[in-house]
Amino acid sequence: MKTLLLTLVVVTIVCLDLGYTLTCVKSNSIWFPTSEDCPDGQNLCFKRWQYISPRMYDFTRGCAATCPKAEYRDVINCCGTDKCNK
């Protein structure tokens, strides 16, 4: 009986882990961020700051398969946990 119970627990844990979907912050608004579930294959969240002028930055957040490449005057942070790109 104990073996059956242990087997069911292990199977449940494995099945739950296979269905995991990463959630990243998507909205560009600092004050009212929204989130999105990342599609299959996109296992990273990113946040990109782009320098526009002194004290002025544009930023973008979302899901990515790989960390986006920084362009001129960009700062990019990538991470792999839920809503880590706040």
Curated annotation (Swiss-Prot):
Keywords, in A-Z order: Disulfide bond, G-protein coupled acetylcholine receptor impairing toxin, G-protein coupled receptor impairing toxin, Neurotoxin, Postsynaptic neurotoxin, Secreted, Signal, Toxin
Residue span of region Finger loop 2: 44-63
GO MF annotation, one: receptor antagonist activity
Signal sequence coordinates: 1-21
Region: Finger loop 1, residue numbers: 23-37
Effect of residue 31 to R: In Tx24; change in selectivity from CHRM1 to CHRM2
Tissues showing expression: Expressed by the venom gland.
Disulfide pairings: 24-45, 38-63, 67-78, 79-84
Residue ranges of the TM segments: none
Region annotation (Finger loop 3) ranges: 66-78
Main location: secreted
Keyword Cell membrane: no
Family matches, as Gene3D superfamilies: CD59
Protein location: Secreted
GO annotation, cellular component aspect: extracellular region
Domain of life: Eukaryota
UniProt family annotation: Belongs to the three-finger toxin family. Short-chain subfamily. Aminergic toxin sub-subfamily.
Further remarks about this protein from its record: Negative results: does not show interaction with adrenergic receptors (ADRA1A, ADRA1B, ADRA1D, ADRA2A, ADRA2B, ADRA2C, ADRB1, ADRB2), dopaminergic receptors (DRD1, DRD2, DRD3, DRD4, DRD5), histaminic receptors (HRH1, HRH3, HRH4) and serotoninergic receptors (HTR1A, HTR2A, HTR2B, HTR2C, HTR5A, HTR6, HTR7). Does not show interaction with muscarinic receptors (CHRM2, CHRM3, CHRM4, CHRM5).
Domain statement: The finger loop 2 blocks access to the orthosteric site of the muscarinic acetylcholine M1 receptor. Comparison of MT7 alone and MT7 in complex with CHRM1 shows that finger loops 1 and 3 undergo large structural rearrangements upon binding to CHRM1, facilitating extensive interactions with the receptor, while finger loop 2 is mostly unchanged.
Job of this protein: Binds specifically and irreversibly to an allosteric site of the muscarinic acetylcholine M1 receptor (CHRM1) at subnanomolar concentrations and shows a very slow dissociation rate. It also inhibits agonist-mediated guanosine 5'-O-(3'-thiotriphosphate) (GTP-g-S) binding and downstream signaling, and decreases the dissociation rate of orthosteric antagonists (N-methylscopolamine (NMS) or pirenzepine). Is a potent negative allosteric modulator (NAM) for CHRM1 activation and a positive allosteric modulator (PAM) for antagonist binding.
Protein name: Muscarinic toxin 7
